[in-house]
Amino acid sequence: DRVLHNRGEVSRKSKEKVLKVIEELGFRPNLYASLLASQKERLIQCVIPEFQPGEFWKKKKKGLQDAAQLVSRYGIRIETVKYDQYSVESFRNACSKVMDNPPSGVLVAPMYGEETLKFVVRLSEAGVPYMFLDSKIDDDGYLAYFGMPMYQSGYLCADILTGGRDVPEKIYVVRIARDKMGLSDPTAARRAGFMDFMKEHYPDVQIDNVFIDPKDKAAIYTKLDQTVGAEKGKRFVVMFNSRIHLVADYLTDRGIHDCRVVGFDCLEKNIEALRSGTVQALVAQHTDRQAVEAVNSMADYLLMGKSVAKRDNFIQMDILNRYNCDYYL
């Protein structure tokens, strides 16, 4: 006790022995008792997209809820501030809500690059530490990032799609319409990795971008009829976000079977498409664990000033197919 709290006289030899044992055991003070004594509440706000049941961000929210239970004993409260991922104005409003009464720390999913940059500048000016979830922007001030290595995931995806196969002259990349309008492009780094792989290994293959509105099924089918559906022979199709099930539904309804399809994330609808053979592979991640790790790291920083061991905390990329997907969820 005297060594830990610098109370009373301790010989140098004894102090060195105690400090050595502390280091070997990885001991840290009893935070629970200390924080109960301080009675100070801290708030971590998580700025994330709105979601429907079964969607990607539902799993992330589950991780945040699990983490909230773990850190609540230390006087830390977790609050989500949601925005419409298809509305830049909604994102601005969510950021303004945070800045109206700045919290102790912020986790943000940066769907809108320029607006996120403005937001984190304001956070820095207010002295609020922040971390990125799922994707990140070019910025020097973030405390940590928790998510896939985006560029490498795109490179991996291209290898899964093409490796050891006769590749057609054209590959269809299905993208959300917001990319084309320049509003938001959270998978830009993933797409860059994919494109670099193709340039290195299949420079003559044409990449055809197909933009869809995920909220308009009729428009999706019309667009895919004009592109994927109009092609004859073997077709390769890829999507860089969690909505490959939209393509799978189209292929099933149209009775199209000669497609190789690769997507991302283990949503139940995507897993169903894997089981049926409509989608051949998914690059998956345990997104709920990302959220838990991010909250725990922010809590350590707020409570002890403990820096994150790694600034970029890349979660592992798992390759799922119809034979192993049931053992992953």
Language model features: what each stretch is:
Residues 71-103, 107-111:
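Central regulatory/effector-binding core of bacterial HTH transcription factors
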Residues 145-172, 221, 270, 286-303:
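Hydrophobic alpha-helical segments within soluble ligand-binding/sensing domains
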Residues 105-125, 208-270:
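Hydrophobic alpha-helical
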